[in-house]
From Swiss-Prot:
The protein kinase domain is predicted to be catalytically inactive. GO terms for cellular component: cytoplasm; nucleus. This is Probable inactive serine/threonine-protein kinase DDB_G0280855. GO terms for biological process: intracellular signal transduction. It comes from Dictyostelium discoideum (Social amoeba). ATP binds at residues 52-60, 75. Belongs to the protein kinase superfamily. CMGC Ser/Thr protein kinase family. MAP kinase subfamily. InterPro entries: Kinase-like_dom_sf, MAP_kinase, Prot_kinase_dom. Residues 46-349 form the Protein kinase domain. It comes from the Eukaryota. Keywords: ATP-binding, Nucleotide-binding.
Length: 392
């Protein structure tokens, strides 16, 4: 039984009339769940079980569109989320980059809609007087699963499809980098995978242009997942570039082989120790440019670890080819990491070199970084409403 069948046959949160017609399919109905209102067209079926996040970051739920026979992931955001400037910037940044890269086949489609919960007949699942008023809904295509789910629930497929999945990630990031954009927050949880193992990215909340100054680069970056962050972003080197994406893909590559998480990364300090155990301790020259004195001193006092054999020991099922690529991707010094062009030319990918590659013919920037970071909640919400809302 497919997910859509489960949704259709479940206890639907859909008020009468239950028969979908041309005249009523686009009518909006509202519900409240855990004190939060959700507004959806009648043609989109949801259940309590398909609401899987309801917190200060918004309400995330899955719907099945009866019109298009497509599964969707929708995130509802109220003005409260925009009052957190970090959350607001993340949303606006994601909108800009999603729109810019939306035509690429490896980027998930999205759209934004604006809806009101007021003056609509409400079916209360949980008694609550709360009404969020006007909200924004971010809609994304739903894939069969995420790369995170694939790695942890189907290790055989993860291992077998490893070269294909990795090649797609590399060529997608190569395309994004060609636009002068660093993704910065690659994570298996934000990489969608379908049944043919084709991948799509669906989150650009921390993406940034290479023309951004260092102080702005690190302003929001503390919120990104530690296990996939490159060493130079942890110890805050003065320079940063596309190599931090190469590191993140290298970590994901290792997880595809392992079938589990490579680094626990519960804190900055523990992650630096784990990295040292994998690829050896760094030299003074490799971290002397750090702008974070505490991190620099901490890493220089880590007990010496050998630079040889750590990857093989940690990932014993990796082939010689895979170890060679991992050693080229996972280096303390970002300038010593293999560029993506070199990686995809490795014989390991010989069965996939026929896949079409794309290059962006123009650069993208959000404009003045200092102006962007001074935007307040109302300004951010207005920009999204004016520039990105595609339906009332």
């Amino acid at each position: 039984m497919e997910i859509k069948d489960i949704i259709i046959n479940s206890n639907l949160m859909l008020p009468p009339p239950t028969i979908l017609t041309i005249n009523n399919k686009d009518d909006y109905t509202s519900f409240t769940f855990k004190g939060k209102s959700i507004s959806v067209p009648r043609k989109q079926r949801i259940t309590k079980k398909t609401i899987y996040a309801c917190d200060i970051n918004g309400t995330m739920f899955q719907t099945y569109n009866m019109d298009t026979n497509r599964l969707l992931i929708i995130k509802k955001i109220s003005l409260l989320q925009f009052k957190n400037h970090l959350q607001g910037r993340m949303m606006l940044r994601n909108c800009h980059y999603q729109r810019f890269f939306n035509h690429h086949p490896f980027v998930s489609g999205f759209k934004v809609s604006k809806r009101k919960s007021l003056n609509i007949k409400t079916k209360n699942l949980i008694e609550s007087p709360v009404d969020d008023g006007t909200d924004l809904y971010f809609e994304f295509d739903q894939s069969d699963f995420t790369l995170y789910q694939m790695i942890r629930s189907d290790k055989a497929a993860s291992r077998k499809q490893c070269p294909y999945v990795l090649y797609q990630l590399l060529t997608t990031i190569k395309y994004i980098n060609s636009a002068g954009v660093i993704h910065r927050s690659l994570d298996p949880k934000t990489i969608a995978v379908n049944k043919e193992y084709k991948t799509k990215l669906f989150d650009f909340s921390f993406s940034i242009s290479t023309d951004y100054p260092t102080d702005i680069f690190f302003k929001d970056y503390e919120e990104t997942p530690w296990p996939y962050r490159s060493p130079e972003t942890i110890i805050m080197l003065k320079e940063f570039s596309f190599e931090c994406d190469v590191w993140s893909i290298g970590v994901i590559f290792a997880e595809l082989i392992l079938g589990e998480q490579l680094f626990r990364g519960e804190s900055k300090q523990s992650l630096l120790i784990e990295i040292s155990e994998l690829i050896g301790t760094p030299t003074y020259d490799e971290c002397k440019e750090s702008t974070n004195g505490f991190a620099r001193n901490f890493i220089l006092n880590i007990p010496l670890k050998s630079r040889h054999g750590g990857i093989k020991k940690r990932i014993p099922n990796a082939t010689e080819e895979e170890i060679e690529i991992l050693e080229g991707m996972l280096c303390w010094n970002p300038k010593k990491r293999w560029p993506i062009e070199r990686i995809i030319q490795h014989p390991y990918f010989q069965n996939y070199c026929h896949i079409e590659q794309y290059k962006c013919d123009k650069k993208f920037s959000l404009g003045s970084p200092y102006v962007f970071h001074r935007l307040n909640a109302k300004e951010i919400k207005k920009i999204i409403e004016d520039e990105f809302v595609t339906q009332p």
